[in-house]
């Protein structure tokens, strides 16, 4: 007989009058004192309802399972198993607690790093703002009721007041204008003394150009090289792709130096900043990015500029390498300070509000800016006053590219109907090349050759206004897409780089044997 509460053989057995159940006396007394009812049936009980059962006092009863060695061993085994299971559960809980503590410590460390970085960026921004305020000249009175000022800068509409209003621009200060003017004077003097380099590739050499190499730089799911630039001092080629990335390619070694990721849409324009390690990119995501080379050789985005409200089509660097311009489909072009990334002026044409800028380039001397529009118009701007000083009409279709010659008075423009050459001295068109869907036009650095990218690549020998511009070479579009998007001349026109609507960068030049012979003749 076992106790109904403990399950053990009772030492002082008692039985309930009402339920007839057997209990250990001390246990049932305690339960009735606390609860006043039977622990099994729940009936009301008092101490008078339990009756002791008398047993022999000489021999005390023993539990059956402890009455033998096997029973004792079984009891010990059960207790050992329970102890091991409890120990295992504790170890699991300890391991989980350690993992949670480690994760919490990592999160705390990361949060401290983010806070430190944000504080550093905040302090740098405050310092730049303080420097800009110190350099800010006395602001002239602005008629806030006008949407555009007479000098071409954007005014402030009534609906732009308040916290969501557009940023007030610092303006191009007198110090900046002096710097641009001094640069113009110096470059103009240098141009008068400049000679065509003896190392320039000859016409005969260009006639022998053939494809030397092809390099797959961009992704296959979104192929297409939309823009390109060359850093002649290091022979590095930069390409902007439809796959949202820009690639820096070392031509001599045939290796990719860095892939610039950060834009969310295609890269529409890319430019090196002089001989520095800075790169500018414009994108259909409405932003311009300034990239710099870090100590490990990788490029990171130093500034992301969000001053435009529509696709940015072009960036062009001023000859000082301190300023640049971006042109957008939002009917404005912006003049930036390169070091701070600040937009000094955002300019629109007061006479034409619905104009979408699709191309832009600085004149080699830096005081003139050329812009192309989706409305087939080429506009010439005075950078100092931001005034539109000339317009060239005649194209049919969007202006896709513009290029100034280093001689200072020729301008080439490409559009969907072909390429036109303009004399800046007389502001007249003096020659037209009928190449449908011309995507890019480019003078070489000496002003001796003109490259045109359309369904193929054409190279012309530059001449005077009256003389004929003779074709030198036609390079086929080997991409199979029938659309060459960009063309650039290498140093001394020793090679031509071509981008197309596939993902490959193609290099055209002299075969090794002919190149060696041509170099010997030059020397």
Curated annotation (Swiss-Prot):
GO terms classed as biological process: defense response to bacterium; DNA repair; innate immune response; mRNA splicing, via spliceosome; protein K63-linked ubiquitination
Residue ranges of coiled coil: none
Residue pairs linked by disulfide bridges in the UniProt entry: none
Enzyme nomenclature, EC number: 2.3.2.-
GO cellular component, one term: spliceosomal complex
Molecular functions per Gene Ontology: ubiquitin protein ligase activity
Function: Probable ubiquitin-protein ligase which is mainly involved pre-mRNA splicing and DNA repair. Component of the MAC complex that probably regulates defense responses through transcriptional control and thereby is essential for plant innate immunity.
Similarity field: Belongs to the WD repeat PRP19 family.
Name assigned to this protein: Pre-mRNA-processing factor 19 homolog 1
Organism listed in the record: Arabidopsis thaliana
Gene (UniProt): PRP19A
């Amino acid at each position: 007989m076992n106790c109904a509460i403990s399950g053990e053989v009772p030492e002082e057995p008692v039985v309930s009058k009402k339920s007839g159940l057997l209990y250990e006396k001390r246990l049932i007394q305690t339960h009735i004192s606390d609860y006043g009812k039977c622990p099994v049936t729940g009936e009301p009980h008092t101490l008078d309802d339990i009756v002791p059962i008398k047993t022999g006092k000489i021999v005390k009863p023993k539990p059956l399972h402890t009455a033998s060695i096997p029973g004792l061993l079984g009891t010990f085994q059960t207790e050992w198993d329970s102890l091991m299971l409890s120990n295992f559960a504790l170890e699991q809980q300890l391991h989980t607690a350690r993992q949670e503590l480690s994760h919490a410590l990592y999160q705390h460390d990361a949060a401290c790093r983010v806070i430190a970085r944000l504080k550093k960026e905040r302090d740098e921004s405050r310092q730049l703002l303080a420097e800009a305020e110190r350099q800010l000249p006395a602001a002239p009175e602005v008629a806030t009721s006008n949407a555009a000022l007479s000098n071409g800068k954007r005014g402030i509409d009534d609906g732009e007041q308040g916290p969501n209003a557009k940023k007030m621009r610092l303006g191009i200060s007198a110090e900046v204008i002096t710097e641009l003017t001094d640069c113009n004077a110096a470059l103009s003097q240098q141009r008068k003394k400049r000679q065509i380099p003896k190392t320039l590739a000859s016409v005969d050499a260009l006639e022998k150009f053939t494809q030397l190499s092809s390099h797959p730089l961009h992704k296959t799911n979104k192929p297409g090289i939309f823009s390109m630039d060359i850093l002649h001092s290091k022979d590095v080629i930069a390409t902007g792709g439809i796959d949202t990335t820009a690639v820096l390619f070392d031509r001599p070694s045939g290796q990719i130096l860095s892939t610039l990721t950060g834009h969310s849409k295609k890269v529409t324009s890319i430019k090196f900043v002089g001989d520095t390690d800075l790169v500018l990119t414009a994108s259909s995501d409405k932003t311009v990015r300034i990239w710099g080379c870090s100590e490990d050789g990788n490029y990171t985005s130093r500034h992301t500029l969000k001053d435009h409200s529509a696709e940015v089509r072009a960036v062009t660097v001023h000859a000082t390498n301190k300023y640049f311009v971006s042109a957008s489909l939002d009917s404005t072009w912006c003049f930036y300070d390169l070091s701070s990334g600040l937009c000094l002026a955002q300019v629109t044409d007061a006479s034409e509000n619905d104009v979408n800028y699709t191309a832009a380039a600085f004149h080699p001397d830096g005081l003139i800016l050329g812009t192309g529009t989706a409305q087939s118009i080429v506009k010439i701007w005075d950078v100092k006053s931001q005034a539109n000083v000339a317009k060239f009409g005649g194209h049919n279709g969007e202006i896709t590219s513009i290029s100034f010659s280093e001689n200072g008075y020729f301008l080439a423009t490409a559009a969907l109907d072909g390429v036109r050459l303009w004399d800046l001295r007389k502001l007249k068109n003096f020659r037209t090349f009928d190449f449908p869907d011309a995507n890019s036009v480019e003078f070489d650095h000496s002003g001796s050759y003109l490259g045109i990218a359309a369904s193929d690549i054409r190279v012309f020998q530059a001449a005077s206004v009256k003389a004929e511009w003779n074709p030198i070479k036609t390079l086929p579009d080997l991409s199979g897409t029938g659309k060459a998007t960009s063309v650039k001349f290498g140093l001394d026109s020793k090679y031509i780089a071509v981008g197309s609507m596939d993902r490959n960068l193609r290099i055209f030049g002299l075969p090794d044997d002919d190149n060696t012979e041509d170099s010997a003749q030059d020397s």
